[in-house]
Amino acid sequence: MLENDELTLIKSVGEKIRLRRLELNLSQETLSYDANIPRNQVGRIERGEISTSITTLHKICKALEIEIRDLF
């Protein structure tokens, strides 16, 4: 089971991804296509429902034109 600080981090990262996606006026579908990950995974990451790999974060950040460090 995840600790509170881990859950907070997962939710914070997801929220930053969502905000950047909206800033770029992208749909979850477009982000999933650009990052080559399933659309439902984008939604779950944004809602803080799942933790994800560094590789997936890298793909998302590349699609959102940000650095991974911008998520923390």
What is each residue range found by the language model?
Residues 65-72:
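Short C-terminal boundary/hinge segments that cap the last helix of small helical domains
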Residues 15-30, 34, 59:
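Short basic helix-loop element that most often maps to the first helix and adjoining turn
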Residues 36-50:
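Recognition helix of helix-turn-helix/homeodomain-like DNA-binding domains
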Residues 17, 31-32, 42-45, 71:
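Conserved hydrophobic/aromatic packing and binding residues within compact polymer-binding modules
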Residues 2-22:
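A short, Lys/Arg-rich alpha-helix, primarily the initiator
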Residues 11, 22-23, 41, 51:
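Short amphipathic helical patch at the helix-1/turn junction of helix-turn-helix
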Residues 49-59, 68:
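Short, basic-rich loop-to-helix N-cap that marks the start of a DNA-contacting helix
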